[in-house]
A protein has these predicted regions:
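The feature captures the beta-strand-to-loop junction immediately N-terminal to the Walker
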Residues: 38-40
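Glycine/charge-rich catalytic "coupling/switch" loops of P-loop NTPases
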Residues: 232, 259-309, 334-357
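Helix-to-loop junction immediately C-terminal to a conserved catalytic motif
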Residues: 53
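ABC ATPase nucleotide-binding domain
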Residues: 3, 28, 64, 344-346
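ABC ATPase nucleotide-binding domains
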Residues: 84-87, 91, 95-238
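Conserved A-loop
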Residues: 9, 24-29
Length: 357
């Protein structure tokens, strides 16, 4: 289990000013679960991760790993990194080129009271976990990028950490290998029952690998939830636009009609699902939830003009003109849409998601 409470970290900027890299961030990771810190560059996700590892000294807050508090600003207490029972996989992998695979993986156990026989046993076990047991004596320079990533993961696991920390570990791999490693890493985490915190700016990666996604922006935790919750029911404009490129549409004159919520959008009338007490200011419509229909005999059907079509293999990524707004839509290749085509589109009311900002 990992608990982060009220974490704060500031860095000095130009002319003596300070920047809040991490601003009152709190979250908890249950034992055996993987939480991803997701956000753009400079949002504070890596600083948060490094604070958990003990590589950054926070200015405020508390960090608890298992039953032990490893950092407390109020108590002025900070446990050294080597005593925090964490393993870390860096973005650069940090594989030593003058060592073999065995020497790289065994390095965290140097200076410990673990016997040579036990060291060998542990290294063989973690290499088997990552599928590299046959490479144990191979020199590090002879490893591929994917193999180096696996060695870095094995090294992080060999000391049997309570929490595994991963700082964009797949970003240096090509697209196809990155996708395969994503699957393998998730399978390993679930099989071993690792408690893990994963940092990435890749939205697809975060959705695919996580039990919980924590969205960060400008040092703050904007939103937290399961991948389905974050994607299907975002609460903030930032989360809606950053994950999945949702269309954020202003809505006004909202009212309840026959148990449904109705409002005005720039191109006309719209029905949407809304069970909250507050009045929404905007609706989120995902590109894949926009469907082409043959007529306008039901609710939420509007005329649209196809302004742009980009072929992406399995889908067409389109820009549609509805009134004065442009919406992004994704259609199957069977739709056969063309630039300039006039169509009717439909969005089910349950896929028009209200947000308050």
């Amino acid at each position: 289990m990992l608990r982060v409470t009220g974490l704060k970290k500031q860095f000095e900027a130009d002319r003596g000013a300070s920047v809040a890299a991490v601003d009152n961030v709190s979250f908890e990771v249950e034992t055996g679960k993987l939480l991803t810190l997701l956000g753009p560059s400079g949002c504070g996700k890596t600083t948060t991760l490094r604070s958990i590892a003990g590589l950054e000294e926070p200015d405020g807050g508390e960090i608890q790993i298992g039953s032990s508090v490893v950092f407390s600003a109020t108590r002025r207490f900070s446990l050294p990194p080597n005593r925090r029972r964490v393993g870390m996989v860096f973005q650069s992998y940090a594989i030593w080129p003058h060592m073999t695979v065995f020497q790289n993986v065994a390095y965290p156990l140097e200076g410990s009271r673990v016997s040579k026989i036990e060291v060998r046993k542990r290294v063989e076990q973690v290499l088997a976990l990552v599928g590299l047991e046959a490479f144990i004596e191979r020199p590090a320079p002879l490893l591929s990028g994917g193999q180096q990533q696996r060695v870095a993961l094995a090294r992080a696991l060999v000391a049997e950490p309570e929490v595994l920390l991963l700082d964009e570990p797949l970003s240096n791999l090509d697209a196809q290998l990155r996708e395969q490693m994503r699957v393998d890493l998730r399978a390993l985490q679930q099989r071993v029952g690792l408690t893990a915190v994963y940092v990435t700016h890749d939205q697809i990666e975060a959705l695919a690998i996580s039990d919980v996604v924590a969205v960060m922006s400008a040092g703050r935790l904007v939103e937290i939830g399961t991948p389905h919750q974050i994607y299907d029911w975002p609460k903030s404009r930032f989360a809606a636009e950053f994950i999945g490129a949702g269309n954020v549409v202003p809505v006004r004159e909202t009212q309840s009609v026959d148990g449904k919520s109705r409002g005005r959008v720039p191109w006309g009338e719209i029905y949407f699902s809304h069970n909250g007490q507050t009045i929404p200011k905007a609706l989120v419509i995902r590109p894949e939830d926009i469907q082409i229909v043959s007529c306008s005999t039901k609710d939420n059907v509007w005329p649209a003009k196809v302004d742009q079509v980009v072929f992406l293999g399995a889908i067409y990524d389109c820009r549609l003109a509805l009134g004065d707004m442009t919406l992004r839509a994704q259609f199957p290749r069977s739709a056969g849409v063309e630039v300039g085509q006039l169509i009717h589109v439909h969005v089910h009311e349950t896929r028009c998601v209200p947000i308050e900002e």
